[in-house]
Amino acid sequence: MKILFIGSRLYDDIDYYVRENGIESIITESNEDAINLDLPDQVFIVPRGMDSPKQIAISQNVDAVVPLIGIDPPLIEVAKMKEELEAETDIPVIAANVRAVRLTSDKIKTKEFYNEIGVPTPQYQILAKDDFESKLKMEFPVVLKQGQGQGGKDIKVAESLDDVKEYFEEFDHALCEKFIEGSEISIEVLGYNGEYVPLSPIYKGETTLEGIHPLNKIKTAPCLVEGLDNNLVQRTAYKVAKNLGSDGIFEMDFMFSKDEQQLYAIEVNTRPNGTRYLTTATCGVNSLCELVNMAAGKFSIKDIQDKLEYYYATEIPIGRYKGPDLNEPLKSFKNNDWVVHGPEGYQRITIRADSKEQLDRYVEDLI
């Protein structure tokens, strides 16, 4: 079995799993100084874009391609390459298709998609710089966003018309969305060949008018929010994934309004994401390793169900880890009760335990 991985930044998460399964690994990477280039069996430094990875997949006679790209801009080119390569050869590319990327990479199209499939999403309208004062019909506070962007980029919680005016000093248009006071929830869904399985919902904290970046929040799992049925989160996530009809990882963000007792869908990411460590800690399923299983033809809902475990877990920003040495593989819970991830100085620790009490003791000892 030979797999081409596109991008090296996330590869250390799965290097141990690739080796355990006897898979020959090739990486294409556009940055010759990128991390993890010493890990795979073979590396090709290539120009940006998908033309070279496509040609290398063919020339090296690989069995599958797994893009490991955790940012949004390249996803449409990856999707186009997927459709071209799969049409021209029998090489599967474990990634979202063009339709799914177009629907999820534009927040306005995502809103329209939710409405089409009957999934509740916060009230919204599109505003323009020239006439927003007369067109704005929603009560404050509202959330202003751009169609594209990730990680909280270009988002502002506006509490007054002056806040909106300030936002339009930089932008010509905005998606204006009702501010939902409540709980932030994320969930990963795995999908391949028409099979979809939602994993454990993650609690990311309460919404704030300050709009705290996700990387600065403490996250916990399983999601324990009063009044919220986690089965509803999983059913809704499954419905979204099934209607997107694509392959790979889907990370979905939701808000739960306690006042309205309503679950709202916010957005979808069709790529590896920051939730994956906490998901793995909680339920024992590593979404990146499942991409490898998809490539190897070993992915199935039954296999996922057989792997499911049940732990209490938390993810905490720590900056720089100063605790005990971890066991190999470092990015796996196979021989560890916690893993450390993120760049030096901006590290996070994800800890798991059999009980809430044991988790609290771990946190007290480590943090």
UniProtKB/Swiss-Prot annotation:
Q: Which residues bind Mg(2+) 2?
A: E267, N269
Which Pfam families does the record match to this protein?
ATP-grasp_3
Give the domain of life. Answer: Archaea
Q: Which cofactors does this gene product need?
A: Mg(2+); Mn(2+)
Binding residues for Mn(2+) 2, per the UniProt record?
E267, N269
State any GO CC term: cytosol
Catalytic reaction annotation: hydrogencarbonate + NH4(+) + 2 ATP = carbamoyl phosphate + 2 ADP + phosphate + 2 H(+)
Positions with a binding annotation for Mn(2+) 1? D253, E267
Q: Which residues of the sequence carry a binding annotation for ATP?
A: 137-186
Task: Specify the enzyme's EC class, one word.
Answer: ligase
User: Matching InterPro entries, A to Z?
Assistant: ATP-grasp (IPR011761), ATP-grasp_PylC-type (IPR003806), ATP_grasp_subdomain_1 (IPR013815), CPSase_Archaea (IPR043673)
Q: How is the cofactor bound?
A: Binds 2 magnesium or manganese ions per subunit.
Q: Which UniProt keywords apply?
A: ATP-binding, Ligase, Magnesium, Manganese, Metal-binding, Nucleotide-binding
For this protein, what is the EC number?
6.3.4.16
About its domains, the entry says: Lacks the domain involved in allosteric regulation present in CarB CPSases.
Q: What else is known?
A: Several lines of evidence suggest that obesity is associated with elevated levels of intestinal methanogenic archaea. Consequently, this enzyme may be an attractive drug target in the treatment of human obesity.
Can you state the subunit structure given in the record?
Forms homodimers and homotetramers (dimers of dimers).
Q: Which family does it belong to?
A: Belongs to the small carbamoyl-phosphate synthase family.
Function, in words: Catalyzes the synthesis of carbamoyl phosphate from ATP, ammonium and bicarbonate. Proceeds via a three-step mechanism, i.e. the phosphorylation of hydrogencarbonate to carboxyphosphate, a nucleophilic attack of ammonia on carboxyphosphate yielding carbamate, and the phosphorylation of carbamate forming carbamoyl phosphate.
Which HAMAP family would you find in this protein's record? CPSase (MF_02221)
Q: What protein am I looking at?
A: Carbamoyl-phosphate synthase
Q: Which organism is it from?
A: Methanobrevibacter smithii (strain ATCC 35061 / DSM 861 / OCM 144 / PS)
